[in-house]
């Protein structure tokens, strides 16, 4: 079974706390890929921290809040890629 996750992230200062990294790295045991959708700008350090557990990081403007982020994350996966996934898990940092 192939599982993927879309993790929605927002921090007004773009800081990635340790618990975020721990969450992502621990879920990699269960998820084949994790796309992080950031609704806030990230610097290189924050991006690198997210990539410790994520397979991809996508930054976007904070429009549409969480739902807009999930929508854009699903669009980034694309229908062909989604068709190869058995389960898609949408989750966030709270």
Stretches found by the model and what they are:
Residues 84-94:
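Short beta-strand-to-loop acidic/aromatic patch adjacent to the donor-nucleotide binding site
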Residues 7-10, 59-60, 93:
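Short glycine-centered, acidic/aromatic-flanked micro-motifs in structured strand/loop junctions
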Residues 22-33:
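Short, acidic, metal-binding catalytic loop of nucleotide-sugar glycosyltransferases
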């Amino acid at each position: 079974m192939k599982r993927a996750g879309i993790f929605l992230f927002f921090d007004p200062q773009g800081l990635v706390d340790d618990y975020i990294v721990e969450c992502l790295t621990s879920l990699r045991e269960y998820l084949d890929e994790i796309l992080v959708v950031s609704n806030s700008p990230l610097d290189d350090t924050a991006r690198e921290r997210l990539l410790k557990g994520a397979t991809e990081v996508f930054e976007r403007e904070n429009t549409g809040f969480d739902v807009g982020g999930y929508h854009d994350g699903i669009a980034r996966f694309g229908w062909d890629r989604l068709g190869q996934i058995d389960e898609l898990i949408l989750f966030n940092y709270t």
